[in-house]
Amino acid sequence: MIKLKNLERRYPLGKEKFFYVLRDINLEIAEGEFVSVMGPSGAGKSTLLHILGMHDHGWEGEYSLNDTAVHHLKPKERATLRNEQIGFVFQQYHLLDDLTVYENLEIPLSYRRYSKSERAAMVADTLDRFQIVGKKDLYPRQLSGGQQQLVGVARAIIAEPKLLLADEPTGNLHSGQGEEIMELFRKLNDEGVTIVQVTHSEKNASYGKRVIQLRDGWVVNK
């Protein structure tokens, strides 16, 4: 599903000098895998995730997603591919404060060619699946941290993405809420969703099937 070849991310420091965030990354992630990316702070974990999610375009090398050569695509084409195939879950929830839960869930569907009635049906199904029907007219500020992250996960998967990317998804939650989110990830993976998560937690990593360790921008295991 994901293939990275000789991928690097660097920033200029001066004349012919660079700071490398990622170095010579060669990776393959198969469809249906649940992979955890781990390593110390500054290892390049979040940068790798943002490259996979096509939010960072300043890298060099080759990146293929489902046999599409991302490195050959223009930014607009990458955005289309991202909206069609990738869902995101962030540590800071990233819900839009001025929109209700219902409206937040509807956002990813606006990038697809769904009719109004189809969007309404998909939102209703998702509200029911995540047991948040009673929260649909509330705003993010009216929800607990766990509830906000639950809505964040629901929004990430409502359009049935092939790939789910999660950056420290339980970082702002207490242990019980974190376990609820990770059990949900396990269930989604069992249903066939490919998941790549960045985490510092060995416990969260244990929910996946493989760990990729980064150190100083290098992959030190696969």
Give names to the regions the model predicted.
Residues 61-69:
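Conserved ABC transporter NBD signature motif
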Residues 158-162:
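A short, proline-enriched helix->beta-strand linker immediately N-terminal to the Walker B motif
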Residues 139-143, 147-149:
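Conserved ABC ATPase signature
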